[in-house]
Amino acid sequence: MGFNEKENSLEYWDNIHSKYERNEIKLDDWLDKFETIIDSCSTPILDLGCGSGNDTLYLINKNKQVISCDQSSNAINNIKKNFPEVYDTKCFNMLDGMPFDNNSFELIIADLCLHYFKEKDTFELLNEIRRILTVGGRLIFRVNSVNDVNHGAGQGNEIEHHLYETSDKRLKRFFDEKDIKFFFKGFDIEYLNEEIMTRYKLEKRLYRVCVKKK
């Protein structure tokens, strides 16, 4: 991702996360499917691309230690304000690498934050995730589906297979099952399912996935 693309992305998300209160954050039950995995995790859980803190709130409600991360300083400032009990926060762009030691986490959550990158950058990002996961550690995530027509699938300039440049010059990738198996071939895929949710009052199609470090 070039400099301008990174700047455009950061400006977009800083605007999205300008200000919100804890009572405005809505819980999403998508992680319930992995309750056993989450409940058995006794070490801090990494929440990548935490945004407004939906998953951070879910994990805190389960008495988990959470490290909430986002590239937007606005998002991180809101997390600190709304969740003073959060274990830790980090503000960084994932394309610059993960500021964590090898084998630091047994569980990483990445909700709708892994589908904004070119193929080369996606593989580098996943290599970083694999580096900081323990052997047998898991990454639980959701990504856009190629069927997500209400949220941009097939729209804009296709610069790579299933990767589009939006009208505001951001990148947005849409996955099918074959794409997920291609990008996550360095992991064992334990769960993979295309699902429907409501986002911004419109139907959204996405994949819910759990992979394990080999």
What are the roles of these predicted feature ranges?
Residues L48:
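Conserved beta-strand/loop positions that form the S-adenosyl-L-methionine
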Residues S73, E119-F123:
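Non-membrane alpha-helical structural segments and their capping/turn regions in soluble enzymes
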Residues M98-I108:
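A short acidic, Gly/Pro-enriched loop at the edge of an enzyme's catalytic core
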Residues P99-D101, K118, D176:
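GHKL-family ATP-binding catalytic core of two-component histidine kinases
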Residues E106-K120:
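A short SAM/SAH-binding and catalytic strip from SAM-dependent methyltransferases
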Residues F123-V135:
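A short glycine-rich, Lys/Arg-flanked "PGG" loop and its adjoining helix->strand segment in the class I
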